[in-house]
Amino acid sequence: MKETIAYLGMGMWGFSLANLLANNGHRVVGWARNPALIEQLSVQRRHPAAPHISIPQNLSFTYHMEEALDGATMIVEGVTSAGMRPVLTQLKALTELRVPLVITSKGIEQNTGLLLSEIALEIFGRPAAQHLGYLSGPSIASEVLRGCPCSVVISAYNPDTLKQIHRAFLTPTFRVYPNSDLKGVALGGALKNVIAIACGISDGFRFGDNAKSGLVTRGLHEIRKFATIMGCRPDTLNGLAGLGDLCTTCFSAFSRNTLFGKLLAEGLTPEQAKTKIGMVVEGVYTALSAHQIATHHRIDMPITTSVYRVLYENLDIQEGIAQLLQRDTKEEYL
């Protein structure tokens, strides 16, 4: 069965998935708030961040959300974590949620500490859980656009919703694996961005592959410990939503979070680094939320804490590195 899909958010990530869904035979209407972007997509049939990609005819665009929702059998969002609440609030004003809503963004809301899925449930109410889905995993947008092989996970509370979303996204090169642990899938995608900043700092100081692999491994341990205390399944974090996404983000040349960390190591301030990158660096905001939650629940997360202190307490990076290296080496999995 082919879907009529409203895709909310036409940044590089949103466009890559909207393009994939259209190439998979679905009718897709992409929405964004920026009229200039929508006009360029509609008239030139090219995305400014990916001008080499031809847009299929069954992918159209609008900056009127109600037009995107007209006849939609599925809604997919691809906005930033900061944009999640206002976009879903606008969506709630236009429709009750009676079709699947697929979250594809990764992050934790500032101030509230809510996962993006929890924001959706707060806005639409607990009964909307039956329509909620979450897609995550190692999926660099530029590679998805090129049709490179990619494996992700999709999670949902309702088995029928899970099957519908799985069917819509699955292609010969975009491998979609079901996972029933929605919260674990969401947390893995959010927390890995903080570890990626630490890996970028390591890259900036040319500490080498041994140090970076150590950060990834110990970072995964932090993520798994955090998620388990939050009620998630540990094995979820050993899979695509945890280890897989963490590896891609920490080692990819296209990772904003890793580049951000590298720029910090080169002497830029956090604000200067964000300005130079010119796009949202989700790990900056997740570091604050994760630190607050970890502190409240007394979860020991030394790498995450160090990144937080560099970003929000002006901790000297060299001092932060020294503190990490001076920690006691306890039993590995304690």
Swiss-Prot record:
Superkingdom in the source lineage: Bacteria
Enzyme class, UniProt record, top EC level: oxidoreductase
Keyword terms, alphabetized: Cytoplasm, Lipid biosynthesis, Lipid metabolism, NAD, NADP, Nucleotide-binding, Oxidoreductase, Phospholipid biosynthesis, Phospholipid metabolism
Pathway: Membrane lipid metabolism; glycerophospholipid metabolism
GO cellular component: cytosol
Binding site for NADPH: W13, R33, K106, A141, R256, V280, E282
BP terms from Gene Ontology: carbohydrate metabolic process; glycerol-3-phosphate biosynthetic process; glycerol-3-phosphate catabolic process; glycerophospholipid metabolic process; phospholipid biosynthetic process
Binding site for sn-glycerol 3-phosphate: K106, G137, S139, K192, D245, S255, R256, N257
Enzyme Commission number(s) of this protein: 1.1.1.94
Family per similarity comment: Belongs to the NAD-dependent glycerol-3-phosphate dehydrogenase family.
Function: Catalyzes the reduction of the glycolytic intermediate dihydroxyacetone phosphate (DHAP) to sn-glycerol 3-phosphate (G3P), the key precursor for phospholipid synthesis.
Name by which UniProt lists this protein: Glycerol-3-phosphate dehydrogenase [NAD(P)+]
Name of the gene encoding the protein in the UniProt record: gpsA
